[in-house]
């Protein structure tokens, strides 16, 4: 039996994290959406298309895993999820007011997490209609359920709605902007175009669905040895039962020859991500002189695929990402009728046609397909080294957007440095491929915790800067205005310490604790030392202090903390400098906040974060809502307890800092000595090398 005194109950209360433009952080949206679906406990055949029972007939259509508008608003009023582990108890609760609940429902719709099966062209929520999770929404739920270690699998994960493998982006922990490089954009482009041209036709067969075993990452290995007692209720095996998780003949409920048409107004069009964007083949352009282009696609189709098949939640962010395909020279516009592509502005439209550039064609490497040539009226072909502009052709250039658009040039890694783990970890594209390799090797947690700890260390540097600023202000000034600054710094200090503790708890409960969902293979003494700190009876984690949630002053803790490391909202600036190479000098327990661990080891390369260019806040009243996201219970103690807990909190963080750094270095050693060596021998690595060679030639 687990000692109750050594069971960690982490309690905190906070608002949604927001970007500089006021948008809710992507991870917060995915979390509240997942808990929302878990609390709804959706079942099959719950609702029919006709809500009046006396009108039901044999021809009435039933929709699986649906819920009503009223059920959604009511459920969000009191969301609660409890996950019991060996030494921790995670209790997550949200109490969301109706105004914010309606706004979140709208966000879930615009993010393609929900749709209305009765009216698949509807893009906004409405009362008296049924809502249903999309394949993208189910994929988000699947990831959350696995990460948090939920013992009971939601039924929808075993259905045909579970069919999507999302492309997931890494984001800045400060601005929530996408961390990208040219190489990552190239990988995304290859995935979007598919293994072969996906030419749409009403007679096409439905896209095949991946088997559930690959989506659930489930392997029924009876040879696995463990010292723990068999507890079927803690796993998913009992739920799977007689379901054939290797079935390759599954059919998606969203498959439809009309709603998958790239010209349709369907809210959701893609239910698998590996088939590629839907193209038009041999489409004719021009008025007096007809010109036929082998493969074309619209900007609406690009945007639709990004929204359906990646974890992007905000519409304008998808537009910015789609524009990067043009910026990097992978696609070129068609400026002949019926295409209505703007010469100076990238816009999303069903009538804005593009085709692959020569560079884009080289990257996709469709086997068995001829080059994407343009056939002129006289029968001759125009190679895609040239781009159509009106009735004349000019050479295709890589630079298709001005620097004034706010896009920063990313530095490409070279093939000569590809055999170094540091460079692979630094480039978002190579890191993505390395992550996929680790997933196949069943050790992706080594990379995940390595990055999580680096973010924790970055937070600690910000905390140290705040402490230093407070001490400097106390020594130099005592005026009223300076006292206000000190109060602001105090508020920021408590918020920053709060976030550091939350990150420490997440790292511990997800990777280090015995029985955690992604338990690391580390030395027993190291695990025990961390557990002694986290589970100490007098740890401030058991009396977690709240931040001031209702302070309307502009000098809030959030603004003070974010001002330390921020980027301009209208540019693709640089992300926080989180070193992805472990420090060579380990700190001891008495030496807190050592600067050696934060030196930027690879200054010659800085991936760029993708930031939205415009503010998108359709409902101002919602933005000012005092609705609270609560983890555990409602902490409404006064600030006195917060101040009293602060020294103990810093003491815990000082003790955790060197231990987490040791874990980070150990994970780096494991990846460098084992996983990376296997990665360099894999087919994925060889393909990456070939792709980089193509980049260097372009």
Curated annotation (Swiss-Prot):
DEP domain mapped to chain residues: 273-358
Modification after translation (UniProt): Phosphorylated by FUS3 and KSS1.
Phosphoserine PTM sites in chain numbering: 252, 408, 539, 587
Region annotated Fungal-DR, chain positions: 10-203
InterPro entries noted in UniProt: DEP_dom, RGS, RGS_sf, RGS_subdomain_2, WH-like_DNA-bd_sf, WH_DNA-bd_sf
GO BP term, pick one: conjugation with cellular fusion
Induction annotation: By exposure to pheromone.
Annotated segments matching region Disordered: 545-586
Positions of the RGS domain: 420-689
Keywords from the UniProt entry: Pheromone response, Phosphoprotein, Signal transduction inhibitor
Keyword Iron: no
Keyword Phosphoprotein recorded: yes
GO cellular component, one term: plasma membrane
Tree of life domain: Eukaryota
Skewed-composition ranges (Low complexity): 551-570
Pfam families given in the database record: DEP, RGS
Domain notes per entry: The fungal-differentiation regulator (Fungal-DR) domain is only found in fungal regulator of G-protein signaling (RGS) proteins that regulate differentiation pathways. It is required for function.
Function, in words: Desensitization to alpha-factor pheromone. Is involved in regulating the signaling pathway for responding to mating pheromone.
PANTHER family: DOUBLE HIT, ISOFORM B, REGULATOR OF G PROTEIN SIGNALING
Note: Present with 5980 molecules/cell in log phase SD medium.
Record protein name field: Protein SST2
Gene: SST2
């Amino acid at each position: 039996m687990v000692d109750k005194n050594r069971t960690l109950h982490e309690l905190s209360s906070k608002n949604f994290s927001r970007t500089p433009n006021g948008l809710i952080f992507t991870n917060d949206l995915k979390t509240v959406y997942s808990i929302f679906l878990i609390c709804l406990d959706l079942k099959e055949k719950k609702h029919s298309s006709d809500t009046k029972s006396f009108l039901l007939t044999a021809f009435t259509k039933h929709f699986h895993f649906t819920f009503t508008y009223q059920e959604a608003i009511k459920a969000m009023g009191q969301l609660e999820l409890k996950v019991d582990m060996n030494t921790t108890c995670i209790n997550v609760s949200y109490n969301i007011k109706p105004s914010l609940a309606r706004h979140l429902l709208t966000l879930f719709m615009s993010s393609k997490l929900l749709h209305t099966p009765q009216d698949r062209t509807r893009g906004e929520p409405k009362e008296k209609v049924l809502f249903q999770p999309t394949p993208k929404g189910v994929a988000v739920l699947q990831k959350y359920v696995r990460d948090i270690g939920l013992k009971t699998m939601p039924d929808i994960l075993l259905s045909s709605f579970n069919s999507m493998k999302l492309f997931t982006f890494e984001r800045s922990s400060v601005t929530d902007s996408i961390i990208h490089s040219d190489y990552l954009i190239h990988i995304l482009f290859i995935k979007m175009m598919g293994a072969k041209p996906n030419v749409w036709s009403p007679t096409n067969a439905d896209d095949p669905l991946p088997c559930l075993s690959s989506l659930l990452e489930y392997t029924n290995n009876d040879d696995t040895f463990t010292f723990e007692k068999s507890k079927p209720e803690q796993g998913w095996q009992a739920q799977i039962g007689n379901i054939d998780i290797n079935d390759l003949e599954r059919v998606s409920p969203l498959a439809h020859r009309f709603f998958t048409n790239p010209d349709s107004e369907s809210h959701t069009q893609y239910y698998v991500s590996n088939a590629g964007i839907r193209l038009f083949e041999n489409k004719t352009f021009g008025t007096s002189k007809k010109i036929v282009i082998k493969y074309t696609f619209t900007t609406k189709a690009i945007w639709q695929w990004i929204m359906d098949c990646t974890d992007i939640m905000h519409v304008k962010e998808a537009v910015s990402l789609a524009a990067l395909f043009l910026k990097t020279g992978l696609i070129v516009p068609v400026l002949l009728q019926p295409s209505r592509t703007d010469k100076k502005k990238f816009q999303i439209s069903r009538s804005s046609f593009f085709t692959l550039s020569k560079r884009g064609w080289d990257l996709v490497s469709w086997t068995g397909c001829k080059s994407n040539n343009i056939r002129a009226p006289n029968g001759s072909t125009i190679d895609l080294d040239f781009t159509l502009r009106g009735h004349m052709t000019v050479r295709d250039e890589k630079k298709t957007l001005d620097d004034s658009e706010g896009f920063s040039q990313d530095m490409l890694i070279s093939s000569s440095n590809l055999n170094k783990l540091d460079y692979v970890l630094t480039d978002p594209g190579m890191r993505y491929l390395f992550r996929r390799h680790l997933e196949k090797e069943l050790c992706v947690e080594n990379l995940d915790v390595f990055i999580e700890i680096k973010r924790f260390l970055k937070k600690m540097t910000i905390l140290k800067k705040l402490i230093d600023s407070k001490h400097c202000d106390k020594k130099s000034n005592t005026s009223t205005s300076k006292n206000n600054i000190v109060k602001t710094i105090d508020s920021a200090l408590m918020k920053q310490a709060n976030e550091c503790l939350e990150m420490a708890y997440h790292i511990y409960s997800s990777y280090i604790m015995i029985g955690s969902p992604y338990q690391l293979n580390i030395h027993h003494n190291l695990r025990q030392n961390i557990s002694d700190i986290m589970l100490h009876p007098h740890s401030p984690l058991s009396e977690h202090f709240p931040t001031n949630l209702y302070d309307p002053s502009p000098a809030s803790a959030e603004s003070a903390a974010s001002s330390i490391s921020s980027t301009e909202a209208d540019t693709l600036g640089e992300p926080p400098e989180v070193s992805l190479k472990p420090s060579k000098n380990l700190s001891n327990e008495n030496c807190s906040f050592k600067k050696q661990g934060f030196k930027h080891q690879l200054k010659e390369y800085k991936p760029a974060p993708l930031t939205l260019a415009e503010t998108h806040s359709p409902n101002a009243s919602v933005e000012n809502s005092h609705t609270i996201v609560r983890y555990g219970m409602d902490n409404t103690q006064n600030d006195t307890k917060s101040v009293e807990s602060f020294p103990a909190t810093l003491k815990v963080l000082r003790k955790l800092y060197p231990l987490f750094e040791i874990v980070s270095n150990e994970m780096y050693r494991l990846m460098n000595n084992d996983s990376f060596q296997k990665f360099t021998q894999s087919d994925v690595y060889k393909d990456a090398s070939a792709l980089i060679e193509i980049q260097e030639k372009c």
